């Protein structure tokens, strides 16, 4: 069998990746109708574990997090769903979808055959099934496929310190947890075609990411799937991700249209990653690791140069793809919906402003002899203000090699300079006078979401701070500034800056 079938009929999967959490729920239906108007019949989405389990055992599937409602709307629009629950998702998403607090659990080692880790992945998968299990096509819903893990072959190639046997055991156990939870639709894996050996798992269809060579695609799928298909490119990239300080990547519409036609001519199903990127709201954007830059934070924008722009507008790429698809599909392609009207917002005057140093004065600090990480402070995101008072003057080179990730340095409220992991700037000259306070405001710019460095993802100041080669110990105060809610500025009285 070299094709996908539904209700006994050959049904090629023409899918687009669109993540519920990156789009306000009020726009979900409009964007899905845009996908239909492009000629697609399926939507793929990751599930973000850390979005839903914000604290151990505390679950949230409301509002923009209402995955089940998103899937129901897909069904109402007569489309199919490919669910990609991870538990690891990459996705340029904070920590690859893992909850930050996993790092606080004794004995925890993520993404491997570790008892503690698998205990928590099982809880996640079982809870997810409660939300979406009834929406499988085997129960009359739109979910047609579920992915096991995610690009695990890449991780196997990067973590050669872990035995191949353990990697295989872990991958099989994640598949087993999905099945045990009650997922009965076909399972699949997705990897680069040269990484199938590490990423494939028995009983799941192997699919390739970014594979443009159709002959090679069929060859490797046949090799790992009993000499048969169906054949699918689970991530077909019409654009690419964006990092801070780097040019916006662009892929030509004509190039994508040509490749789309090649897939359609050769009975290859595909999933555009992304068809509509949306926005990394709040502190959800992730980062890559790079030896030259140490960290490459992702942007708040997840436009991805996708066929549907971040704002939800049709692009030339959208039109090019639509023109190709309509030549090959048997079903009618509807007219794309009208764009959502753009409103004009008048100027907004900020009349009450409070800076972070003043805000910290309203917060009870945590005291320690050395700086504590975000995780030790039981904080996932935002900022931490580290302060240390000096009774004697000191000057020289301030060094914070364990900075994660960006710091503004003050002495008695006066800005001295900036340290930045992204530019590998970990030191600066400093002069701290008698009876002065060193203040270091540290920002978490997003936990690494890809590669072997994902296991080193604590934030804040994670190693000793030195001045003139001397470690500064004793008397550290940490002020937690998660920025998860707006401060009540009236509480600051006359100290609030007024414009």
Residue ranges and their predicted role:
Residues 19-37, 56-73, 169-170, 254, ...:
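Aromatic- and glycine-enriched glycan-recognition loops and surfaces
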Residues 72, 83, 87-120, 126-272:
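Substrate-binding/catalytic cleft of secreted carbohydrate-active enzymes
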Residues 118-132, 139-147, 153-154, 158, ...:
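Carbohydrate-binding surfaces of carbohydrate-active enzymes
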Residues 22, 49-51, 89, 152, ...:
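Feature marks short, surface-exposed loop/turn motifs that line or immediately flank catalytic pockets
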Residues 1-27, 33-42, 229-231, 481, ...:
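An acidic-aromatic substrate-binding cleft motif
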Residues 9-11, 46-58, 63, 91-116, ...:
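Aromatic- and acidic-residue-enriched carbohydrate-binding clefts of CAZyme catalytic domains
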Residues 28-96, 100-101, 175-180:
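Aromatic-lined substrate-binding rim segments of carbohydrate-active enzymes
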């Amino acid at each position: 069998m070299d094709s996908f079938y539904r209700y006994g009929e050959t049904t090629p999967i023409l899918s687009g990746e669109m993540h519920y959490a990156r789009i306000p729920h009020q726009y979900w239906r409009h964007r899905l109708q845009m996908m239909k108007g492009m000629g697609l019949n399926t939507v793929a989405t990751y599930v973000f574990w850390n979005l839903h389990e914000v604290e151990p055992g505390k679950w949230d599937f409301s509002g923009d997090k209402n995955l089940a409602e998103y899937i129901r709307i897909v069904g109402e629009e007569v489309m199919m769903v490919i669910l990609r629950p991870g538990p690891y998702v990459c996705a340029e998403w904070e920590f690859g979808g893992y909850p930050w607090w996993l790092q606080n659990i004794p004995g925890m080692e993520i993404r491997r055959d570790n008892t503690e880790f698998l205990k928590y992945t099982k809880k996640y998968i079982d809870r997810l099934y409660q939300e979406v299990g009834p929406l499988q096509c085997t129960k009359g819903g739109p979910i047609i496929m579920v992915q096991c893990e995610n690009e695990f072959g890449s991780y196997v190639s990067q973590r050669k310190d872990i035995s191949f046997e353990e990697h295989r055991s872990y991958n099989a156990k994640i598949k087993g947890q999905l099945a045990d939870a009650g997922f009965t639709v076909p399972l699949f894996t997705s990897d680069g075609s040269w990484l199938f050996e590490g990423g494939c798992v028995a009983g799941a269809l192997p699919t390739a990411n970014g594979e443009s060579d159709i002959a090679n695609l069929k060859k490797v799928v046949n090799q790992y799937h009993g000499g048969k298909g169906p054949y699918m490119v689970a991530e077909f990239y019409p654009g690419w991700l964006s990092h801070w300080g780097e040019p916006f990547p662009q892929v030509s519409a004509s190039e994508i249209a040509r490749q789309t036609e090649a897939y359609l001519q050769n009975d290859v199903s595909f999933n555009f990653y992304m068809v509509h990127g949306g926005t990394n709201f709040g502190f959800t954007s992730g980062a890559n690791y790079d030896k030259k830059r140490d960290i490459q934070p992702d942007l708040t924008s997840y436009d991805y140069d996708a066929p549907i722009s971040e704002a939800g507008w049709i692009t030339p790429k959208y039109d090019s793809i639509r023109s190709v698809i309509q030549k090959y599909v048997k079903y009618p392609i509807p007219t794309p919906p009208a764009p959502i009207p753009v409103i004009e917002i008048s100027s907004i005057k900020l009349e009450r402003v409070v800076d972070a140093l003043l805000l910290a004065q309203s917060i009870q600090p945590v005291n320690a002899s050395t700086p504590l990480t975000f995780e030790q402070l039981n904080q996932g995101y935002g900022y931490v203000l580290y302060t240390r008072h000096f009774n004697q003057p000191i000057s020289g080179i301030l060094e914070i090699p364990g900075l994660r990730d960006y710091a503004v340095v003050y002495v008695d409220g006066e800005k001295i300079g900036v340290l930045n992991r992204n530019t590998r700037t970990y030191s600066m000259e400093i002069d701290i006078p008698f009876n002065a306070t060193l203040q270091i405001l540290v920002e978490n710019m997003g936990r690494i979401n890809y590669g072997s460095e994902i296991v080193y993802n604590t934030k804040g100041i994670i190693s000793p701070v030195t001045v003139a080669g001397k470690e500064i110990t004793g008397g550290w105060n940490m002020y937690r500034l998660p920025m998860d809610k707006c401060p009540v500025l009236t509480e600051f009285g006359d100290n609030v800056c007024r414009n």
